């Protein structure tokens, strides 16, 4: 099995570019990765990074304590950790946000990734070793006993669903405009959307082309969520469902469509 990479990636990952000290620091950062992640997440959640960004001259530790209502100890732990993480700076007894801290707070992609990893993945990662050895999603048991997460999406806690779909939609929605031009370049009238999820792409299709009929092939649970999301919207009458488990090799694949679209290509791969 070979891995193919674009030339730019080959240049970046084909040779060593770090000095020994840089490599050693990275190794230490990796060893404390979970702490780096959680402290940084809480710096955003508690509003501390935003306070530092909004403050022209920075804030003292006592001022952060006063503004957040957190204990001296809690603020001290987070600010000192953030200093070594690289998201805050310290000068003349005052803390300010670094460039990395600014992006941590303001980059929407960072927020989507952080929510996804904390709410959806974090607890399950503890079972990664079992998952790799057994070839099964062992970490999924923190939420339920389904064969894959897709059977249980509709039953996940509300915040977990929000972060899952937030991640899914952010990575896919930004590609819809270009994708629609390609899909309908050949006068497509019937489209099979494999793994259409909540029907966002299907809704864009029926809005883009007033004649197309879209059939979403997905798990029955997903189709139920799709119907709730599209109910009452213009063009929803041209969106149909075909319930099937794509992992079951015995399930026949629908035919006689002008085009077949896989939404997963926009965010999963």
Feature names for model-found ranges:
Residues 226-227:
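Conserved SAM-binding loop
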Residues 198-210:
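Conserved SAM-binding loop of SAM-dependent methyltransferases across substrates and taxa
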Residues 213-218:
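Conserved SAM-binding motif I beta-strand of class I
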Residues 187-197:
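Conserved class I S-adenosyl-L-methionine
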Residues 9-54, 66-189:
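Conserved Class I S-adenosyl-L-methionine-dependent methyltransferase catalytic core
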Residues 249-260:
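A short acidic, Gly/Pro-enriched loop at the edge of an enzyme's catalytic core
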Residues 235-247:
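Conserved SAM-binding strand-loop segment of SAM-dependent methyltransferases
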Residues 262-265:
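A short beta-strand submotif of the Rossmann-like class I SAM-dependent methyltransferase core
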